[in-house]
Amino acid sequence: MTVPTTIRLPSKQTVILEGDDLRLRIDDNAPLPVLRPDEVLVRTMAVAINPCDYKMHERFPSPGAVDGCDFSGVILAIGAGVPSLGVSFQIGDRVCGAVHGSNPIRHDSGSFAEYIASEAEFTLKIPDSMSFEEAAALGGTGLATLGMALFRTLELPGTPEEPAQKPLTVLVHGGSSSVGTMAMQLLRLVGHIPITTCSPRNFALAKEYGAEEIFDYHEPDCGQKIKAYTRNTLRYVLDPFTDAKSIALCCGAMGRAGGRYACLEMYPDYLVEKRTLRVGFVMGPALLGHRLELDYGYERAADPEMRQFGIRWYRSIQWLLSKGQLKPHPLRVLPGRFDAILQGIEMLKSKSVSGEKLVVSIGM
C-alpha cells in the first residue's frame, strides 16, 4: 500500500452501520476499512442516498455492516496491486464511484463512512468542472445497474464510443427519477431513443435529460397511449419499480411481438410466464463479479465474465466524463453530515422526494 508520509490516518472513524437491533445508527468508533491490493483508500467528501440504502439492510440484516453505496472523495492511499491493473491513480486524485453497502460478506465496505476502500477498476476520476456533491449524485450504483440493464438484459447495440447506427425506441418508466434521467442520457449517447413516463410536474425535467416523448403515468390508459405512439412495435422496457402498477403499464405498452424487459426489483413469477417477454432482474453490485451472499433470488455466484464487462463499462463511463457528456440528477444537499444521511433515508422511505437526488457533504 502506498501512503504519503505527510498523511497520518486515524485508527477510528465515524460510520453509519446496522446495529444489533437491526436499525441503522451512527458509530463514532468504527475501524477504517482494510485496504486490499486492488483498492484505493478514499477520504469521503460527499455521499448520495439511494433506496437500496434502506432496502438492503432491511431485506438482508447483518449487524455491524456499514451502509451506503454512492460516494465521492479524495484518494489517500493506493493498494500495492493497483499499478498492474491498467488504471492510473495518484494520491490526491478526486474520485467517485459506488461500493456494496450493507454487505454481509464484508462489513466495512459501505460508503456512509469517513473513509472508503474502493476497487480501483470501479473508481472514476472526477472532472475538474464537477463538484464533489455532483460527482456523488452521478450515482455509481445507477451507472453499474444501467450498464447491465441496457447492454446485458435488453442487449441493446452500440457503445458510447461507437453508437448504434439504427436507433431503437426504449421505454424508461419513471423518467424523472435519478436512474431514469441517467438511463435517458446513456440511451441518447449510445444512439437510441428514450421515451418515458412521469408526473406532469416533471415533464420539463424528463425532456431536459433526453426524453423524446413523455406520458403521464397517472392516466389509466397510459400504456395504451404508449402502444399507439410506438405503433404497437415497442420491444424494450426498463422498469425500475417492478410493482403491480408498473408491470401492468409497461406490459400494456409493449408491442404485439413482445420483447425484452429489464427489472430493477425482483419480478413476480407471472411476468416470466408471458412467452413473448424475455425478463431480466438487475442488481448493481453484481457488476463487480463477486459472489453475492444474499437470499430470496438476490444471490449471485461469482461471475468473472460479468466483471470484465463491468471494467469495460467503467472505462466507457470515464471516457464520457472526460468529455463532459454526463450530468447528475438535480441535487438537494442536506446539511448535517451523518445525521442528515439518516434523515435522508427516512425521506426516501416515506416517498417525500421527487425530481431530486439527496446528497450529503461529509468532508470537513
From Swiss-Prot:
<dbReference type="Pfam" id="PF08240">
    <property type="entry name" value="ADH_N"/>
</dbReference>
<feature type="binding site">
    <location>
        <position position="217"/>
    </location>
    <ligand>
        <name>NADP(+)</name>
    </ligand>
</feature>
<feature type="binding site">
    <location>
        <begin position="199"/>
        <end position="202"/>
    </location>
    <ligand>
        <name>NADP(+)</name>
    </ligand>
</feature>
<feature type="binding site">
    <location>
        <begin position="176"/>
        <end position="179"/>
    </location>
    <ligand>
        <name>NADP(+)</name>
    </ligand>
</feature>
<feature type="binding site">
    <location>
        <begin position="284"/>
        <end position="288"/>
    </location>
    <ligand>
        <name>substrate</name>
    </ligand>
</feature>
<dbReference type="InterPro" id="IPR036291">
    <property type="entry name" value="NAD(P)-bd_dom_sf"/>
</dbReference>
<dbReference type="GO" id="GO:0016651">
    <property type="term" value="F:oxidoreductase activity, acting on NAD(P)H"/>
</dbReference>
<feature type="binding site">
    <location>
        <begin position="141"/>
        <end position="148"/>
    </location>
    <ligand>
        <name>substrate</name>
    </ligand>
</feature>
<dbReference type="InterPro" id="IPR011032">
    <property type="entry name" value="GroES-like_sf"/>
</dbReference>
<protein>
    <recommendedName>
        <fullName>Trans-enoyl reductase ccsC</fullName>
        <ecNumber>1.-.-.-</ecNumber>
    </recommendedName>
</protein>
<comment type="pathway">
    <text>Mycotoxin biosynthesis.</text>
</comment>
<comment type="subunit">
    <text>Monomer.</text>
</comment>
<dbReference type="Pfam" id="PF00107">
    <property type="entry name" value="ADH_zinc_N"/>
</dbReference>
<comment type="function">
    <text>Trans-enoyl reductase; part of the gene cluster that mediates the biosynthesis of a family of the mycotoxins cytochalasins E and K. The hybrid PKS-NRPS synthetase ccsA and the enoyl reductase ccsC are responsible for fusion of phenylalanine with an octaketide backbone and subsequent release of the stable tetramic acid precursor. The polyketide synthase module (PKS) of the PKS-NRPS ccsA is responsible for the synthesis of the octaketide backbone. The downstream nonribosomal peptide synthetase (NRPS) amidates the carboxyl end of the octaketide with a phenylalanine.</text>
</comment>
<comment type="similarity">
    <text>Belongs to the zinc-containing alcohol dehydrogenase family.</text>
</comment>
<dbReference type="GO" id="GO:0000166">
    <property type="term" value="F:nucleotide binding"/>
</dbReference>
<dbReference type="InterPro" id="IPR020843">
    <property type="entry name" value="PKS_ER"/>
</dbReference>
<feature type="binding site">
    <location>
        <begin position="264"/>
        <end position="265"/>
    </location>
    <ligand>
        <name>NADP(+)</name>
    </ligand>
</feature>
<dbReference type="InterPro" id="IPR013154">
    <property type="entry name" value="ADH-like_N"/>
</dbReference>
<keyword id="KW-0547">Nucleotide-binding</keyword>
<dbReference type="InterPro" id="IPR013149">
    <property type="entry name" value="ADH-like_C"/>
</dbReference>
<dbReference type="InterPro" id="IPR047122">
    <property type="entry name" value="Trans-enoyl_RdTase-like"/>
</dbReference>
<keyword id="KW-0521">NADP</keyword>
<feature type="binding site">
    <location>
        <begin position="353"/>
        <end position="354"/>
    </location>
    <ligand>
        <name>NADP(+)</name>
    </ligand>
</feature>
<feature type="binding site">
    <location>
        <begin position="52"/>
        <end position="55"/>
    </location>
    <ligand>
        <name>NADP(+)</name>
    </ligand>
</feature>
<keyword id="KW-0560">Oxidoreductase</keyword>
